[in-house]
Curated annotation (Swiss-Prot):
This is Protein-methionine-sulfoxide reductase heme-binding subunit MsrQ. The gene is msrQ. Keywords: Cell inner membrane, Cell membrane, Electron transport, Flavoprotein, FMN, Heme, Iron, Membrane, Metal-binding, Transmembrane, Transmembrane helix, Transport. The keyword GTP-binding does not apply. It is found in: Cell inner membrane. Belongs to the MsrQ family. It comes from Bordetella parapertussis (strain 12822 / ATCC BAA-587 / NCTC 13253).
Length: 206
């Protein structure tokens, strides 16, 4: 027997729980910092951890549409914006770690790094796209952009690909591809589902 559709009230109860869950990694950093648990290199730990949680939140965001269709719960789409904004939040912290700790707030050094290191180039491109989606995630932006809003926000899949490539190139230099392969496989499944759904709709329209 299919589950009853989630109501607006139920989604309203889920949102605070999702918000708290989204902040847990951030809170954990403070707890680790207060208890000398940020490893021997806290800067590297926080940079890597913020990047990992950016990718996790991004994949959760991409999973909302398949999940709502597979479960018959269209109201789940109301959680997608929060997941996407958490991806941008952790992505901003990851970007800030690079700007502040790695490049010392030096614009010239940042531009050189973007131009010389491919994994930085694709990571920077992913962040710029994420910033554009975060800035246009409001109801006002949806009304203002109209049909162009949906086209713009499909760039989330490009962001996913760029993020995986960024992670892959970074880990490839250390011959450690286990995590990039895991996250890349999840992204491939989500993209495959999306393509299959598009193909079915196209066939039904003929």
């Amino acid at each position: 027997m299919p589950a009853a559709p989630l109501t607006a009230r139920a989604i309203g109860r889920i949102k605070p729980l999702l918000f708290v869950a989204g902040l847990l990694p951030f809170a954990r950093w403070f707890w680790l910092g207060a208890n000398d648990g940020l490893s021997a290199n806290p800067v590297e730990f926080l940079t890597r951890s913020s990047g990992t949680w950016t990718l996790v939140c991004l994949l959760v965001t991409l999973a909302i549409t398949p999940l709502r269709r597979l479960t018959g719960q269209p109201a789940l789409v109301r959680l997608r914006r929060m997941c996407g904004l958490f991806a941008f939040f952790y992505g901003s912290l990851h970007f800030l770690a690079w700007v502040w700790w790695d490049r010392g707030l030096d614009p010239v050094s940042m531009l050189q790094d973007v131009g010389e290191r491919p994994f930085i180039t694709v990571g920077f491109a992913a962040f710029v796209l994420m910033a554009a989606l975060a800035a246009t995630s409001t109801q006002w932006a949806m009304r203002k952009l109209g049909k162009r809003w949906q086209v713009l926000h499909r760039a989330v899949y490009a962001i996913g690909l760029l993020a995986i490539l960024h992670f892959w190139w970074h880990k490839a230099g250390k011959n450690d591809l286990q995590q990039p392969l895991l996250y890349g496989s999840v992204l491939a499944l989500l993209l495959g589902w999306r393509v299959a759904a598009w193909w079915r709709r196209r066939g039904a329209a003929r």
